[in-house]
Amino acid sequence: MSELADSGPSGASAPSQLRAVTLEDLGLLLAGGLASPEPLSLEELSERYESSHPTSTASVPEQDTAKHWNQLEQWVVELQAEVACLREHKQRCERATRSLLRELLQVRARVQLQGSELRQLQQEARPAAQAPEKEAPEFSGLQNQMQALDKRLVEVREALTRLRRRQVQQEAERRGAEQEAGLRLAKLTDLLQQEEQGREVACGALQKNQEDSSRRVDLEVARMQAQVTKLGEEVSLRFLKREAKLCGFLQKSFLALEKRMKASESSRLKLEGSLRGELESRWEKLRGLMEERLRALQGQHEESHLLEQCQGLDAAVAQLTKFVQQNQASLNRVLLAEEKAWDAKGRLEESRAGELAAYVQENLEAAQLAGELARQEMHGELVLLREKSRALEASVAQLAGQLKELSGHLPALSSRLDLQEQMLGLRLSEAKTEWEGAERKSLEDLARWRKEVTEHLRGVREKVDGLPQQIESVSDKCLLHKSDSDLRISAEGKAREFKVGALRQELATLLSSVQLLKEDNPGRKIAEMQGKLATFQNQIMKLENCVQANKTIQNLRFNTEARLRTQEMATLWESVLRLWSEEGPRTPLGSWKALPSLVRPRVFIKDMAPGKVVPMNCWGVYQAVRWLRWKASLIKLRALRRPGGVLEKPHSQEQVQQLTPSLFIQK
C-alpha cells in the first residue's frame, strides 16, 4: 500500500503526455507482470507497445520517442510495483482468510465443547430431578457452570467482533487499493489519450507535408511542361519568321532580277533600233562591192564572238545552277537537322518542314524553269541579235557580280541558321537534362517512399500476426486464474455452508437444552442465558445476511461486467470497421487475416461503480474465463466441422450448459 501511495503522485505529474490506453495494452502489460516475477525488459515493452500501436510510431520524432520510452519505462516500473503490491495484498488476504478459517474452527471447537458441557449439565440435571434433597449443592455447581458458559459466550462474542473488525479493515484496505489503482489507471488513460491526440496531429501534419510536396512536384512538372511547350512555340515562330524573311528576300531578289532583265531588254531594244538605223545607213552606203565581204567577215566575227558569249553565258548558267544546287543542299541540310531535332515534337513540325521543303523546292524549280526559259530566250535572241553582244556582255558581267553578292550572302545566312540551330539544340538538351533530373528525383523519392511504406506495413503485419499468440497466452493465464479462483470460492463456500449448518444445529441443541433447563429449574440466570443465546443467534443471522449480501454484490458485479463487455465488444467492432474503412486501401491484402484477431474479447472492462471516485478498469476474471471456455468450445466445434479436422469426444452436458449465453447474465 505504501508503494502504491508513493507511486501515485509520480504518475499524476504528467497528465498530458500519453494517449488513451486501450484494453489490449493494459491486458498485455498487467498479464505479463502477473505471470512473470522478473521485471520486463525495454525490448519486450517496445515490442508489446508497438504491437498495440502500429500506425502511430512512424510520425513521432526521435527526441519525442526517447522521452516517450523513458516515460514508458517509468510507468512500467510503477505498474510492476503496483502488481507486486497487489500480490502482497493478495497474500495478506489469503493469510487473513486462513486465519479466519482457523478461528472459525476454534469457534466450532468451543461450541462443541459448550454442547458437550450442556449435555453433561443435562445428564447431571436428571439425577437432580430424581433426588430433590441434593438440589442445593448441585444448584451451586450449576451456577458455576452457567458462569463459565457466560464467560465462554463473551469470549465467542469477542472473537466474532475481532473477526468482523479484521474483515472491515481488509475490506477498507482492498477498497483503498482499488481506488488507488483506479486513479492511477485513469491518469495513465488520460496521459495515453493525450499522447494519441498528439500522434494523430503529427500524423496529420506529416500527411499534409506529403500532400504539399506531391502538389509542389505536380506544379513543378506542369511548369516545366508549360516552359517546354512555350519554348517549342517560340522556336516554331522563329523558324516561321525566318522562313518568311527568306521567302521575302528570295522574292525581292527575283523581282530585282526580273526588273534588271526588263531594263536590259529595253536597252537592247534601243540599241537594236539604233544599230538597225546605222546598219541601214551603212547598208545603203556599202551595198555594193563590200556587201559580200562584210557579210563574210561579220559572219565569222559574229560567230566567234557569239561562241565566246555563249560559252560565258553557259558558264554563268552553270554557276547559277551550281549556286541553286548549293542553296538547295544547304536548305535540305537545315530541313534534315530541323526534322531530326523536332522529330519528338510531333507531326505538326514535320508537316511544316515538309511544306517548307516543298515550298523551297517549288521556288527552286521555278527559278530553274525561269533560268532555262531565260537561257532559251537568250539563245533565241543570240541567234537573232548576234551583233548586239557587246551590250549583253556588260549586263552579263553585272549579273555575275550580283550573283556573286548573292552567293556571298547565302553562306552567312546558312552560318547564322547553323548557329541558331546549335543554340536551340543546346537549350533543348539543357531543358531535357533538367526534365530528366526532375523526373529521376521524383522517381527516386517515390521509390524511397514506397520502400518505407512497404517496410512499415511489413512491421505492422508482423506485429498484428503476433497479437493472437499474446492474446491466447493471456487467455490461458486467465483460465488458470479462473480455475484456481473457482476452486477456492467453491471450497470456501462449501466450508462456510457446512459451518453455518453446524452452528445452526449446535444452536438448536443449545436452545433445546436451555428449554429443558428452563422447564426443570426456572430462574433469572436461565432467562439471561436464553437472551444471550438469542443475541448470539441474531449475530449469526446477521453474519449470514452479510454473506448473502456479499454474494448478491458479486452477482451484480458479474452482471455489470457482462453488460459492459457486450458494450465494449460492440464499440470495438465499430472502431475496427471505422479503422478498416480509413486505412483499408493502404493496407495489404495479407492484413485481412489479422482482422478477426482484433475482435477478440477484451480482458479489461470498464466498471462504472457508483461508489468509486473515478471510472476504473477492473479484472473480470469470472466472466472472462466463461467467455474463454465458450470460445474454446466454439473453436473445437469449428475444427470438427472442417473436412481435415480431428474428431474429438462429444461435449458433456456441463460444457454444453457453459455455452449458453445466459451464463453471462447470471454470474
Curated annotation (Swiss-Prot):
GO terms for biological process: bone mineralization involved in bone maturation. Residues 76-182, 215-302, 384-410, 457-521 form a coiled coil. GO terms for cellular component: early endosome. It is found in: Early endosome. Keywords: Coiled coil, Endosome. It comes from the Eukaryota. Pfam families: CCDC154 (PF15450). Overexpression suppresses cell proliferation by inducing G2/M arrest. This is Coiled-coil domain-containing protein 154. It comes from Homo sapiens.
